[in-house]
A protein has these predicted regions:
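Fe(II)/2-oxoglutarate oxygenase catalytic core
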Residues: 1-91, 99-120
Length: 120
């Protein structure tokens, strides 16, 4: 958790987040490990991570990649097609609302594993 919080602090610096833009106290939703299998329709189509009352508390989401996988990137369609490779130990942080529509492409050769970590 300390390493993840260190990356969150980097995110805040990179985007010049001011104290009035960040909650004084926050937590992390229970982590969820996701597995996507190759040679199946295992992928996650375009979506956002805040859809209803229950998920509206999320203000930042992290994907921690648990393995190396050259295929199965996370793609942000409305951010100039930015994509992030599945590289073990890498962490992608992004706001969960509608401007950050993203998808998880399906892996090709081996399973893809990631941990989802929404901040509340």
């Amino acid at each position: 958790i300390n390493a993840i919080m260190g990356k969150v602090e980097e995110y805040k610096k990179d985007f010049n987040i001011q104290p009035y833009q960040w909650p004084e106290k926050f937590g992390i939703e229970p982590p969820k490990i996701k597995r996507y299998m190759p040679d199946t329709d295992d992928e996650f189509p375009n979506h956002v991570d805040v859809l209803d009352y229950e998920t509206a508390r999320r203000f930042l989401v992290g994907f921690l990649y648990l393995d190396d996988n050259s295929k199965g990137q996370t793609v942000f369609d409305n951010q100039d097609g930015a994509s992030f490779d599945c590289k073990r130990g890498s962490l992608v942080l992004f706001p969960p609302m509608w401007p950050w529509i993203h998808r998880g492409e399906k892996p090709v050769l081996k399973p893809k594993y990631l941990m989802r970590l929404p901040l509340l």
